[in-house]
Amino acid sequence: MTKVGLRIDVDTFRGTREGVPRLLEILSKHNIQASIFFSVGPDNMGRHLWRLVKPQFLWKMLRSNAASLYGWDILLAGTAWPGKEIGHANADIIREAAKHHEVGLHAWDHHAWQARSGNWDRQTMIDDIARGLRTLEEIIGQPVTCSAAAGWRADQQVIEAKEAFHLRYNSDCRGAMPFRPLLESGNPGTAQIPVTLPTWDEVIGRDVKAEDFNGWLLNRILRDKGTPVYTIHAEVEGCAYQHNFVDLLKRAAQEGVTFCPLSELLSETLPLGQVVRGNIAGREGWLGCQQIAGSR
């Protein structure tokens, strides 16, 4: 039996309004619990369009057929008009998710975090996280115990900023296994649960065809030497590719693969490490990567 942490990122208004209810229904039918990370502030994701001038981002958008994958409402959100606030407008959906799944903060403003947080000072970052946590807690009526940085934009500054909130764990980086990042003080920080597996949009049209993706991914899961964690997006697997996701769950069950919330992957003793800026194939720009203590 192979246990895989299932993380669901919700980036947009449409992903929350349309994708999350579909995913909740799918997961209920398959008796699966997951960790769902919500963006709760303005939906400004369309402002990423300026990144089309960067060849790597343009190629990603073309090979993944982004217009069909996400829809033009997502691709243009917050461009010619202010982005709609996601959280309170979809409070009932978020509360329903929290009844059955582990719910955490993805971002206040997903676009702002992904585009600008790398240049924020620590207090600006703390204020932004606090705003998101406060909003999500108002919606679900209970403390939020976990978070996942938007776009995996995380480094030592993010690690230090999140210590102020005493969360149970964060999932801010890519890596191989859960660990505790070393703080500037030399003490271990809040547990990190890295994503170990590639997302749909990182590999489609580059490493694998859409129709072959599920078999390809299951092979990666079964060969994973660490603690496998897989991320799906409400805007993808909850919308245009929900049938592919259902097929993945059926095939996974046949292979003895089970999915669980990320918190179930935590253990009392974790290795020490750091979150450093790095790059991975299929994703434009830097992102947080796990570095085990003592490695280079």
Curated annotation (Swiss-Prot):
This is Probable 4-deoxy-4-formamido-L-arabinose-phosphoundecaprenol deformylase ArnD. InterPro entries: ArnD, Glyco_hydro/deAcase_b/a-brl, NODB_dom, Polysacc_deacetylase_ArnD. It catalyses: 4-deoxy-4-formamido-alpha-L-arabinopyranosyl di-trans,octa-cis-undecaprenyl phosphate + H2O = 4-amino-4-deoxy-alpha-L-arabinopyranosyl di-trans,octa-cis-undecaprenyl phosphate + formate. HAMAP family: ArnD. Pathway: Glycolipid biosynthesis; 4-amino-4-deoxy-alpha-L-arabinose undecaprenyl phosphate biosynthesis; 4-amino-4-deoxy-alpha-L-arabinose undecaprenyl phosphate from UDP-4-deoxy-4-formamido-beta-L-arabinose and undecaprenyl phosphate: step 2/2; Bacterial outer membrane biogenesis; lipopolysaccharide biosynthesis. The keyword Metal-binding does not apply. GO terms for cellular component: membrane. Catalyzes the deformylation of 4-deoxy-4-formamido-L-arabinose-phosphoundecaprenol to 4-amino-4-deoxy-L-arabinose-phosphoundecaprenol. The modified arabinose is attached to lipid A and is required for resistance to polymyxin and cationic antimicrobial peptides. GO terms for molecular function: hydrolase activity, acting on carbon-nitrogen (but not peptide) bonds, in linear amides. It comes from Escherichia coli (strain 55989 / EAEC). It comes from the Bacteria. The keyword Hydrolase applies. Pfam families: Polysacc_deac_1 (PF01522). Its EC number is 3.5.1.n3. Residues 2-260 form the NodB homology domain. Keywords: Antibiotic resistance, Hydrolase, Lipid A biosynthesis, Lipid biosynthesis, Lipid metabolism, Lipopolysaccharide biosynthesis. Belongs to the polysaccharide deacetylase family. ArnD deformylase subfamily. GO terms for biological process: 4-amino-4-deoxy-alpha-L-arabinopyranosyl undecaprenyl phosphate biosynthetic process; lipid A biosynthetic process; lipopolysaccharide biosynthetic process; response to antibiotic.
